[in-house]
Amino acid sequence: MPAMELEAWTWPDSLDALAAAPASHRLLFESDAVRVIETRIAPGETTELHTHRWPGALYVLSFAHFVRRDAAGEVQVDTRNGAPLAEPGTVVWSGQLPPHTLENVDTQPIHVIGFELKDSKPESEASFAG
C-alpha cells in the first residue's frame, strides 16, 4: 500500500492526547514510525479536549456508545444514532482527529489500543476486520 502525505497539522503539541488527556491515554510504545497508545474511557466519563495527529488502527478490547464533540462543543459523532459498534477483537481505522472530546454514554467501558502511523496514511479511511 503506497504511503500518502499526512494532512497539514496546525494544533499545538499541548493538545496531543498524551499531554492533554493523560487520564484516558497511556503510551505503551513509541518509535520514529509508530506510536502505540492505550485508551480507556469509563462509562459516563468525558475526556479532556485533545488531538490525534496521526492516523492509525485501533484494536478494540471493549467498546461502547460515545459522543465526540469538537473544540466548540458541537457534536461530530453520536454512535447512538444507528452507527454499528465495533466488537471486541476487531480492528478499526481512525484518521487524524483535530481537537475533540469523547464522552462514553454507555454502561460499559471503552478500551482500545491505538497504533498511530507517524509517516504514512493508508488509502482507506474506514475498514473493519474481525
Name each model feature, range by range:
Residues 51-72:
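Short, conserved beta-strand element in jelly-roll/cupin
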Residues 56-58, 71, 110, 122, ...:
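A ubiquitous, low-specificity "background" feature that marks scattered single residues
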